[in-house]
Amino acid sequence: EPNSIWS
């Protein structure tokens, strides 16, 4: 995902 904040 390019804009993934969740790890």
Swiss-Prot record:
A GO term from the CC aspect: extracellular region
Tissues in which the protein is found: Expressed by the venom duct.
Keyword set, alphabetical order: D-amino acid, Hydroxylation, Neurotoxin, Secreted, Toxin
Modified residues (4-hydroxyproline): 2
Modified residues (D-allo-isoleucine): 5
The organism's place on the tree of life at top rank: Eukaryota
Record's comment on post-translational modification: Occurs in 2 forms, vil-I' contains 4-hydroxyproline at Pro-2, vil-I'(O2P) contains unmodified proline at Pro-2.
Main localization category: secreted
Compartments where found: Secreted
GO terms for MF: toxin activity
Job of this protein: May act as a neurotoxin.
Note, other: The mature peptide does not contain cysteine residue.
Protein family per UniProt: Belongs to the conophan family.
The name this protein goes by in its record: Conophan vil-I'/vil-I'(O2P)
